[in-house]
């Protein structure tokens, strides 16, 4: 039986406008140049880019480096950007450097502001109800099993892209997507629930720290029908 639509979730309209920036490219470039000199780089360039996800890309040689920084940071205070630049240059130097707490606090403070842009760039509609399944039902079953806390919050979406992954998430934006190929009749509940739980494990583990992946793996192993779900996923040509 086809799942009926209930009252839909809010639909976000992207509000990003580069004129709203409080940090121009010139200031970002200056911060990265100043930090870079402390690490032996005398020619450093940096600018913001509208990446769908938070990320930093760079090219470098002996004395020069060029950075493209997610524009989700184009309203960040100098302290956050300086700490970010220091962490990146530490990583370039070969050290296993975690991003600083200031960056994580900033993302938490501006999460709601960045959500419309994130959803638009990823081409996502923040609605949990699909044709046959409601992702909120998965969350409720996981709560009933005691696998996730009752106060955990995230945005649930169906992903209509061509990805073979059963689910994906942005830990920073707390957005969890499930492949629309699972929104079909006959898909076992334990598979749907595992697709959601596997990514909720990452949301519960946090971000930016090397220990986060290990904690997500530990939580993932607690799912009662994990082996059966993985077998079904593999048999249907999909991956985690």
Stretch-by-stretch model annotation:
Residues 196:
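A conserved beta-strand element that flanks and buttresses the S-adenosyl-L-methionine
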Residues 1-193, 203-240:
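Active-site-proximal or metal-binding-adjacent scaffold patches in catalytic folds
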